[in-house]
């Protein structure tokens, strides 16, 4: 069957019919079509997971995953081998108030016959599984510390369990299979949304790492260029110092700045066969003077020693 627009006023609701179709999101869809639709969701989810750190968990989307195989087998054993088979139980779907469904017989409160039906392992199993789905996907939302990894993995596991369990009962109970597929579709959609978020976070981390790495490389490159200039400054100090030394560092720098600046302008700053002149493209003489006086002459050992030897020490007054 194809997909047809449903003439239903409740277009936002999912309505499970007694035939092999359901009204889903305002459209009528067959069980097989719905199954194929969820298969596409699984493929989309696997693709998005492969782009982030959850790529290692894509095996949970497979039917032969150990936990899924064990859980499906456990449910089969528990509900299809139950002692309740052949007995009557209360209706699996009933909106009638509790008081209406019960009456007193010989002083005992009993459920009325019309509100009972034969035990159905598929419906009984779904009632149990649906409750577990709600509980296990909600718990990670309230447990501290809050972890999106725990939330995602819980949704992923139970989406797969619900999907493969629905697949396993398609030929036994189509209505219940629809319900299982519907819950699986909801959980897969949430998983896809979480992968989009995780991919965004991963991309931001990668970008930050690239920027940090570039910053470190840029800082190292700039330091290498400065080292060349510092060596030239030490050379100029030693070659140009007057016999009686300079009065102070300011006088020395003012005398040396022109030849040092000429050196900077002429040098290509070849480092590892690469031209690093762009590292001083925005440097000015005034900025260089300030850097020499307030940083290099105080913190760079070679420059500091050169100035200490070349600047006249003030005689202490007796």
UniProtKB/Swiss-Prot annotation:
Domain of life: Bacteria
Official protein name in the record: Uncharacterized protein YfjH
